[in-house]
Protein backbone atom coordinates (compact mmCIF):
# COMPACT_ATOMS: atom_id res chain seq x y z
CA UNK A 1 0.00 0.00 0.00
CA UNK A 2 1.36 3.42 -0.97
CA UNK A 3 1.81 5.80 1.91
CA UNK A 4 1.24 9.52 2.02
CA UNK A 5 3.65 11.68 4.01
CA UNK A 6 1.84 14.91 4.86
CA UNK A 7 4.36 17.39 6.28
CA UNK A 8 2.89 20.28 8.30
CA UNK A 9 5.28 23.20 8.71
CA UNK A 10 4.85 26.50 10.55
CA UNK A 11 6.43 28.56 13.28
CA UNK A 12 6.00 27.94 16.99
CA UNK A 13 2.43 28.88 17.88
CA UNK A 14 1.17 28.57 14.29
CA UNK A 15 -1.39 25.91 15.19
CA UNK A 16 0.33 22.88 13.66
CA UNK A 17 -0.84 20.58 16.46
CA UNK A 18 -4.44 21.77 16.16
CA UNK A 19 -4.49 21.31 12.40
CA UNK A 20 -2.72 17.93 12.56
CA UNK A 21 -5.38 16.73 15.02
CA UNK A 22 -8.09 17.99 12.64
CA UNK A 23 -6.46 16.13 9.75
CA UNK A 24 -6.21 12.93 11.79
CA UNK A 25 -9.96 13.13 12.58
CA UNK A 26 -10.85 13.97 8.97
CA UNK A 27 -8.74 11.28 7.30
CA UNK A 28 -9.72 7.97 8.89
CA UNK A 29 -6.57 6.18 7.80
CA UNK A 30 -4.07 8.68 9.16
CA UNK A 31 -1.61 8.88 12.04
CA UNK A 32 -0.26 12.09 13.59
CA UNK A 33 3.38 12.17 14.65
CA UNK A 34 4.91 14.91 16.75
CA UNK A 35 8.59 14.51 17.60
CA UNK A 36 8.00 16.42 20.84
CA UNK A 37 5.32 13.91 21.84
CA UNK A 38 7.62 11.01 20.90
CA UNK A 39 10.43 12.46 23.01
CA UNK A 40 8.14 13.08 26.00
CA UNK A 41 6.82 9.49 25.77
CA UNK A 42 10.36 8.08 25.71
CA UNK A 43 11.28 10.17 28.76
CA UNK A 44 8.08 9.22 30.61
CA UNK A 45 8.61 5.52 29.88
CA UNK A 46 12.24 5.77 30.99
CA UNK A 47 13.47 3.97 27.88
CA UNK A 48 17.14 3.94 26.96
CA UNK A 49 16.50 6.75 24.46
CA UNK A 50 14.33 8.57 26.99
CA UNK A 51 17.05 8.61 29.64
CA UNK A 52 19.58 9.84 27.08
CA UNK A 53 17.21 12.56 25.80
CA UNK A 54 16.30 13.68 29.31
CA UNK A 55 19.98 14.20 30.08
CA UNK A 56 20.52 16.11 26.82
CA UNK A 57 17.57 18.43 27.51
CA UNK A 58 18.54 18.90 31.17
CA UNK A 59 21.95 20.13 29.97
CA UNK A 60 20.29 22.66 27.65
CA UNK A 61 21.38 20.91 24.48
CA UNK A 62 19.41 20.04 21.35
CA UNK A 63 18.49 16.44 20.67
CA UNK A 64 20.55 15.22 17.71
CA UNK A 65 19.10 14.61 14.27
CA UNK A 66 20.25 11.01 14.57
CA UNK A 67 18.04 10.37 17.62
CA UNK A 68 15.07 12.26 16.17
CA UNK A 69 15.34 10.57 12.76
CA UNK A 70 15.66 7.10 14.32
CA UNK A 71 12.52 7.69 16.39
CA UNK A 72 10.60 8.89 13.32
CA UNK A 73 11.85 5.97 11.21
CA UNK A 74 10.72 3.52 13.91
CA UNK A 75 7.29 5.18 13.97
CA UNK A 76 6.99 4.93 10.17
CA UNK A 77 8.09 1.26 10.16
CA UNK A 78 5.55 0.28 12.84
CA UNK A 79 2.69 2.37 11.47
CA UNK A 80 0.18 0.77 9.13
CA UNK A 81 -1.92 3.86 8.42
CA UNK A 82 -2.11 5.12 4.84
CA UNK A 83 -1.38 8.76 5.74
CA UNK A 84 1.26 9.91 8.22
CA UNK A 85 0.90 13.54 9.28
CA UNK A 86 4.21 15.02 10.42
CA UNK A 87 3.75 17.82 12.96
CA UNK A 88 6.69 20.22 12.59
CA UNK A 89 9.00 17.54 11.22
CA UNK A 90 11.33 17.71 9.44
CA UNK A 91 12.79 20.91 10.90
CA UNK A 92 16.11 20.83 9.06
CA UNK A 93 17.30 19.81 5.61
CA UNK A 94 19.19 16.85 7.11
CA UNK A 95 15.92 15.59 8.62
CA UNK A 96 14.14 16.08 5.28
CA UNK A 97 16.83 13.99 3.57
CA UNK A 98 16.41 11.24 6.19
CA UNK A 99 12.63 11.26 5.75
CA UNK A 100 12.89 11.06 1.97
CA UNK A 101 15.07 7.94 2.36
CA UNK A 102 12.12 6.30 4.16
CA UNK A 103 9.80 7.05 1.25
CA UNK A 104 9.32 4.47 -1.47
CA UNK A 105 8.74 5.23 -5.15
CA UNK A 106 4.98 4.98 -4.47
CA UNK A 107 5.00 7.32 -1.45
CA UNK A 108 3.17 10.58 -2.05
CA UNK A 109 4.65 13.57 -0.25
CA UNK A 110 2.83 16.82 0.38
CA UNK A 111 4.09 19.85 2.33
CA UNK A 112 1.72 22.38 3.89
CA UNK A 113 3.24 25.53 5.36
CA UNK A 114 1.11 27.50 7.84
CA UNK A 115 2.20 31.11 7.35
CA UNK A 116 1.54 33.69 10.01
CA UNK A 117 3.34 36.94 10.90
CA UNK A 118 5.92 36.75 13.71
CA UNK A 119 4.12 39.38 15.81
CA UNK A 120 1.01 37.21 15.93
CA UNK A 121 3.05 34.07 16.67
CA UNK A 122 4.67 35.82 19.64
CA UNK A 123 1.25 36.98 20.90
CA UNK A 124 -0.08 33.43 20.63
CA UNK A 125 2.94 31.90 22.37
CA UNK A 126 2.82 34.39 25.25
CA UNK A 127 -0.95 33.93 25.58
CA UNK A 128 -0.52 30.15 25.57
CA UNK A 129 2.16 30.51 28.24
CA UNK A 130 -0.40 31.82 30.70
CA UNK A 131 -2.10 28.42 30.70
CA UNK A 132 0.52 25.96 29.42
CA UNK A 133 3.01 26.28 32.23
CA UNK A 134 5.82 26.04 29.65
CA UNK A 135 8.79 28.09 30.79
CA UNK A 136 9.66 28.98 27.20
CA UNK A 137 6.25 30.55 26.45
CA UNK A 138 7.35 34.14 27.09
CA UNK A 139 8.21 37.05 24.78
CA UNK A 140 12.02 36.74 24.96
CA UNK A 141 12.09 32.96 24.54
CA UNK A 142 9.48 33.15 21.76
CA UNK A 143 11.62 35.63 19.81
CA UNK A 144 14.65 33.32 20.15
CA UNK A 145 12.63 30.29 19.05
CA UNK A 146 11.38 32.21 16.03
CA UNK A 147 14.92 33.23 15.05
CA UNK A 148 16.03 29.57 15.16
CA UNK A 149 12.89 28.53 13.29
CA UNK A 150 13.47 31.06 10.48
CA UNK A 151 17.13 30.07 10.07
CA UNK A 152 16.15 26.42 9.56
CA UNK A 153 12.83 27.02 7.80
CA UNK A 154 14.18 29.14 4.96
CA UNK A 155 16.72 26.43 4.07
CA UNK A 156 14.00 23.77 4.31
CA UNK A 157 11.73 25.61 1.89
CA UNK A 158 14.60 25.97 -0.60
CA UNK A 159 15.29 22.22 -0.35
CA UNK A 160 11.59 21.33 -0.71
CA UNK A 161 11.27 23.48 -3.82
CA UNK A 162 14.56 22.15 -5.27
CA UNK A 163 13.20 18.60 -4.92
CA UNK A 164 9.92 19.64 -6.59
CA UNK A 165 7.85 18.33 -3.68
CA UNK A 166 4.20 19.43 -3.71
CA UNK A 167 4.27 22.57 -1.55
CA UNK A 168 1.26 24.59 -0.41
CA UNK A 169 1.12 27.76 1.67
CA UNK A 170 -1.92 28.25 3.90
CA UNK A 171 -2.53 31.72 5.33
CA UNK A 172 -3.19 31.01 8.99
CA UNK A 173 -4.76 34.32 10.03
CA UNK A 174 -8.30 32.92 10.12
CA UNK A 175 -9.82 30.78 12.83
CA UNK A 176 -8.98 27.07 13.11
CA UNK A 177 -12.05 25.97 11.12
CA UNK A 178 -11.36 28.45 8.32
CA UNK A 179 -7.74 27.31 8.12
CA UNK A 180 -8.79 23.65 8.09
CA UNK A 181 -11.12 24.36 5.16
CA UNK A 182 -8.10 25.71 3.25
CA UNK A 183 -6.16 22.56 4.16
CA UNK A 184 -9.02 20.39 2.86
CA UNK A 185 -8.65 22.31 -0.42
CA UNK A 186 -5.03 21.11 -0.53
CA UNK A 187 -6.25 17.52 -0.06
CA UNK A 188 -8.24 17.80 -3.28
CA UNK A 189 -5.06 18.87 -5.12
CA UNK A 190 -3.15 15.79 -3.95
CA UNK A 191 -5.94 13.22 -4.16
CA UNK A 192 -6.79 12.89 -0.46
CA UNK A 193 -10.39 12.93 0.74
Swiss-Prot record:
Q: Where does AMP bind?
A: 35, 40, 61-63, 88-91, 95, 134
Q: Which reaction does it catalyse?
A: AMP + ATP = 2 ADP
PROSITE patterns registered for this protein in UniProt: ADENYLATE_KINASE
Annotated Gene Ontology cellular components are: cytoplasm; mitochondrion
Q: Which GO terms describe its biological process?
A: ADP biosynthetic process
Which keywords label this protein?
Answer: ATP-binding, Cytoplasm, Kinase, Magnesium, Metal-binding, Nucleotide-binding, Transferase
Claim: Phosphoprotein is one of the keywords in the record: no
EC primary class: transferase
Q: Where is this region: NMP?
A: 34-63
UniProt: ATP binding residues: 13-18, 128, 174
What this protein is reported to do is described as: Catalyzes the reversible transfer of the terminal phosphate group between ATP and AMP. Plays an important role in cellular energy homeostasis and in adenine nucleotide metabolism.
Q: Which organism is it from?
A: Entamoeba histolytica (strain ATCC 30459 / HM-1:IMSS / ABRM)
Recorded family membership:
Belongs to the adenylate kinase family.
GO molecular function terms listed in the Swiss-Prot or TrEMBL record: adenylate kinase activity; ATP binding; metal ion binding
Where is the segment annotated LID? 127-137
Q: What is this protein called?
A: Adenylate kinase
Amino acid sequence: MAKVFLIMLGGPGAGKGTQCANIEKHLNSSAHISTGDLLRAEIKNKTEIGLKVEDIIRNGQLVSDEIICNMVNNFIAKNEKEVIVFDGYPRAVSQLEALLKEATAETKICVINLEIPDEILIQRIVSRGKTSGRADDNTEAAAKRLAVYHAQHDEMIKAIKAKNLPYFVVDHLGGPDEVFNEIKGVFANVGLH
